[in-house]
C-alpha cells in the first residue's frame, strides 16, 4: 500500500486510505468492490489500482458503461496474457508485468545462497509497465515463450 500511496501523492493526487477494498485476489469480489466505489463516488475517481490483473479487469469491466469512469486509469499487476490483450484493445489501461522466468531463477539462486549460508539481500526481478504502446510487443513475446 505504501507504494500506491507514495505514487499518488507524488502525482499530486489524494490517496483515499479509507477506500482500500480487499477482494481476496478474486474477480467476483472486485466487481462488488467496484460497484461500491461507483456508488460512493458517482462523479468518478482518477485511478483504480488492483493487486492482480483479474481484479483490474473485473473492475474495469464493471465501470465500462459508467461515463463518469471513462477516464479512470485501471492498473493491474502480473502482465498475464488476457490483461495484455485487454490493454491492447483499450479495456484496461495498463498492467505491471512481472518477469516469471527471473522470479523462478532468482528464487532458486536465493535458496542456494541460504542453503550455503551466504548473505543475500532484497531480490528485484524487475517489472515492465505494459501500455498500448508496448502491448503488442509483449503479446509477441508470449508467442515466442510458448513455442
Predicted regions and their residues:
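Hydrophobic alpha-helical
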Residues: 4, 19, 23-85
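Hinge/cleft segment of the Venus flytrap/periplasmic-binding protein
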Residues: 6-11, 99-147
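Structured segments of extracytoplasmic/periplasmic soluble domains
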Residues: 7-14, 33-40, 62-66, 86, ...
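A generic structural signal for alpha->beta connector loops
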Residues: 14-17, 71, 91-92
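Conserved beta-strand scaffold positions in the cores of enzyme catalytic domains, especially
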Residues: 17-20, 74, 95, 129
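Short glycine/serine/threonine-biased micro-segments
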Residues: 48, 74, 88, 102, ...
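Short beta-strand elements at the ligand-binding edges of bilobed clamshell
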Residues: 89-101
Amino acid at each position: 500500500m505504501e507504494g500506491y500511496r507514495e505514487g499518488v501523492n507524488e502525482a499530486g493526487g489524494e490517496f483515499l486510505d479509507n477506500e482500500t477494498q480487499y477482494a481476496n485476489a478474486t474477480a467476483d469480489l472486485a466487481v462488488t468492490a467496484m460497484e461500491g466505489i461507483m456508488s460512493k463516488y458517482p462523479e468518478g475517481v482518477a485511478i483504480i489500482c488492483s493487486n492482480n490483473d483479474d481484479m483490474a479487469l473485473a473492475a474495469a469491466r464493471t465501470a465500462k458503461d459508467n461515463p463518469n469512469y471513462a477516464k479512470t486509469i485501471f492498473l493491474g499487476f502480473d502482465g498475464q496474457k488476457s490483461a495484455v490483450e485487454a490493454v491492447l484493445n483499450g479495456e484496461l489501461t495498463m498492467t505491471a508485468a512481472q518477469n516469471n522466468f527471473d522470479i523462478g531463477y532468482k528464487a532458486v539462486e536465493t535458496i542456494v545462497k541460504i542453503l550455503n549460508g551466504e548473505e543475500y539481500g532484497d531480490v528485484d526481478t524487475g517489472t515492465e509497465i505494459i501500455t498500448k504502446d508496448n502491448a503488442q510487443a509483449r503479446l509477441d513475446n508470449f508467442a515466442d515463450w510458448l513455442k
